[in-house]
From Swiss-Prot:
Keyword Cytoplasm: no
Organism: Mastigocladus laminosus
Protein name (Swiss-Prot/TrEMBL): C-phycocyanin beta subunit
Regions that span the bilayer: none
Any one biological process term the GO annotation gives: photosynthesis
Amino acid sequence: MAYDVFTKVVSQADSRGEFLSNEQLDALANVVKEGNKRLDVVNRITSNASTIVTNAARALFEEQPQLIAPGGNAYTNRRMAACLRDMEIILRYITYAILAGDASILDDRCLNGLRETYQALGTPGSSVAVGIQKMKEAAINIANDPNGITKGDCSALISEVASYFDRAAAAVA
């Protein structure tokens, strides 16, 4: 994302044979500042990924105990491990989308066809969607912690982060 912006601005100035204007430099400085916020959020989510996934799964299974009961979709260690793995993969691709500022990597490499795969396997997409929403709550709480991150208003970024989780939940529901 940032690299493309820098390349575009420099190429435009170069094609006109001009130095970068103060406005262009300010805009690029803002891109860096916003990029630092993205890095902070991704770093926090990544550093806490295991906890986010585990706690989301635990909360999901408390709400929907039939999933881990005999005959449930997460019953047996193998199925439980597959559930946790899938939640972790979805979270990982959400962090890629946050970093890029673009949902296409999430859609193209993770979500496209996921609902159909779950349907074919008999996995309840609505339960996966609940798990994703629980990961969203945890990730946003972690991302909103003001300690040790780039200062500034992050409300737009947090809304964007929430939208990636919502997109993932809608894709599997």
